[in-house]
């Protein structure tokens, strides 16, 4: 079977854009097979397999769980004719052919605002808040090291300065993701 490997950058806030990308690829004759970390820093490795072009709905669900809950979780989606593709970074990837969709409500896993809002809240609580807490602890510590690095010479000053710079870049990226998720949460809360 012919394979295609694509490297893309999607943040956890871009899960809807990611599903649209998979839908477009499937319509061109490439179905998603696997999602992995890549050797590239921020990009994710997507493996596609050649298939007949068709209209397919892709959905992602962020639902970290115990292994004991996994079989029940997957069976729920199987009962609703959603094919489980793979799991990556606590996201489960599903697809369903449009020919198997009987109503508009079946195009999405969460077809109501409450379900979508619950998923966004899980992402915020389990992914974004821990990273922000670590950065909140790490950055002041680095500034304290910067004050002391003068005693250790130029190289330690440069190392601490670079660490501060990279931490601030990471803070900007995480803040941008948080901003997108916060707006998504607000939009869903208003429905």
Regions found by a protein language model. Give the residues of each.
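Terminus-proximal functional modules
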Residues: 1-191
């Amino acid at each position: 079977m012919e394979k295609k490997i694509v490297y893309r950058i999607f943040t956890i806030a871009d899960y809807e854009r990611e599903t649209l990308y998979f839908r477009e690829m499937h319509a061109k004759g490439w179905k998603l097979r696997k999602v992995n970390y890549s050797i590239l820093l921020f990009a994710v490795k997507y493996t596609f397999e050649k298939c007949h072009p068709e209209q397919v709905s892709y959905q992602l669900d962020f639902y970290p769980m115990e292994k004991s809950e996994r079989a029940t979780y997957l069976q729920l989606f199987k009962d609703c004719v959603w094919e489980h593709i793979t799991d990556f970074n606590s996201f489960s990837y599903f697809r369903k052919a449009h020919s198997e969709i009987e109503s508009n409500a079946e195009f999405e896993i969460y077809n109501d605002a409450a379900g979508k809002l619950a998923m966004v809240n899980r992402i915020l609580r389990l992914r974004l808040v821990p990273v922000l807490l670590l950065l909140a602890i790490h950055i002041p510590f680095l500034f304290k090291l910067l004050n002391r690095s003068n005693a250790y010479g130029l190289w330690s000053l440069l190392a601490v300065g670079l660490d501060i710079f990279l931490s601030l870049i990471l803070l900007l990226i995480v803040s941008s993701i948080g901003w997108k998720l916060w707006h998504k949460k607000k939009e869903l809360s208003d429905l």
